[in-house]
């Protein structure tokens, strides 16, 4: 959408240009100023993003509008609308009657459909940066509009984004605010958004265990290492290993728990129980030898593939993994693109005997 006036077009062009510090006064006079800093506009594919030193990674134009409305910043409400922001989304954060009247004059309707609220939620959260995830938390976690949407749909969005977590606690939270706070915190850990993680860590100390669960579940060994070395962890190492093993190919956090002394046979047994075949092979690489118990478990569950695997007597530990390294950089280097040695042995056996 093109700006509706020549003045708006001029401002849009100016916002895309590099301006020296000496000329910031021009941007301020033109209204290209927010949070005591200049506004920069740029495009990423088909979407328009607004950047400021505070939002240095950029936020979407519609998101910037909602924030400007929340702050009752009339000049920016008008400017962002002229640049193409959907004025109807302003209803998500309007908190003053005169701001509401301004939005009406700019074409906002009287209310939003639940589907529109969900669409904005879905579109906004897709931008995975620290500043945007923090902003999403501030805009949505206590937003009464979001509480009026279809909770089943919202919980499904949350579930699929964090489906690798081993717990359904987040989608069963009684508190709407707590559910969304955990959601944004989980996103920050999943995508290793350092500034966002630090924000949630400082603001929500009671969610330290949730941070640990997310680090284990999302294979974030760097975050796990920091937690284990800076916080008092009230969780048994074998429970930590069980959480890490619930998602397949979680080699980094499984190895870290192994290095801290977790029972690798118990980890193998748990991997079999949850049909995590790659984790099972990796546990064998780490020296697990609970073959008989795991075979019996696989037979009880009817896991014919695992029964076939464990019926062979060809597996042994991989010596290069037994040093129990806890440096996350070294672990990441060691296991980057790692293919379990025992899985390779099984693949070769099948090729030799079935092809």
UniProtKB/Swiss-Prot annotation:
What InterPro entries does the annotation carry?
Answer: ASFV_MGF360
Q: Which Pfam families match?
A: ASFV_360 (PF01671)
Sequence ranges of the ANK repeats: 60-92
Coiled-coil stretches are none
The Gene Ontology biological process terms listed for this entry are: taxis
The alphabetical list of record keywords is: ANK repeat
Q: Which family does it belong to?
A: Belongs to the asfivirus MGF 360 family.
Quote the function comment for this protein.
Plays a role in virus cell tropism, and may be required for efficient virus replication in macrophages.
What is the protein name given in its UniProt record? Protein MGF 360-3L
- Origin species: African swine fever virus (isolate Tick/Malawi/Lil 20-1/1983)
């Amino acid at each position: 959408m093109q700006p509706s006036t020549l003045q708006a077009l001029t401002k849009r062009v100016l916002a895309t240009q590099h301006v020296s510090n000496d000329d910031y006064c021009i941007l301020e006079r033109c209204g290209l100023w927010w949070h005591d800093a200049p506004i920069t506009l740029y495009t990423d594919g088909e979407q328009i993003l607004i950047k400021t030193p505070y939002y240095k990674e950029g936020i979407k134009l519609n998101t910037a509008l909602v924030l400007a409305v929340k702050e009752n910043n009339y000049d920016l409400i008008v400017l962002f609308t002229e640049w193409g922001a959907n004025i109807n989304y302003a209803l998500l954060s309007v908190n003053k009657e005169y701001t509401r009247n301004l939005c009406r004059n700019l074409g906002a309707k009287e209310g939003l459909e639940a589907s529109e609220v969900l669409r904005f939620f879905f579109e906004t959260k897709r931008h995975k940066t620290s500043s945007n995830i923090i902003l999403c938390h501030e805009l949505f976690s206590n937003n009464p509009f979001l509480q009026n949407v279809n909770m089943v749909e919202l919980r499904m969005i949350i579930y699929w984004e964090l489906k690798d977590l081993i717990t359904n606690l987040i989608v069963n939270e009684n508190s709407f605010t707590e559910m969304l706070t955990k959601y944004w915190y989980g996103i920050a850990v999943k995508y290793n958004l350092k500034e966002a993680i630090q924000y949630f860590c400082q603001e929500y100390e009671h969610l330290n265990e949730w941070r640990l669960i997310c680090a284990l579940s999302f294979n974030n060994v760097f975050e796990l290492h920091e937690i284990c070395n800076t916080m008092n962890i009230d969780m048994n190492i074998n429970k930590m290993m069980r959480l890490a093993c619930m998602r397949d190919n979680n080699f980094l956090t499984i190895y870290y728990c192994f290095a801290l002394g977790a029972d690798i046979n118990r980890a193998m047994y748990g991997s079999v129980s949850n049909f995590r075949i790659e984790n099972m092979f990796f546990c064998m690489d780490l020296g697990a030898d609970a073959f008989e118990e795991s075979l019996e478990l696989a037979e009880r569950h009817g896991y014919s593939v695992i029964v076939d695997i464990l019926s062979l007597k060809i597996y042994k530990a991989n010596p290069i993994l037994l040093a129990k390294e806890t440096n996350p950089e070294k672990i990441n280097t060691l296991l980057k693109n790692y293919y379990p040695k025992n899985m390779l042995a099984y693949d070769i056996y099948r090729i030799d005997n079935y092809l």
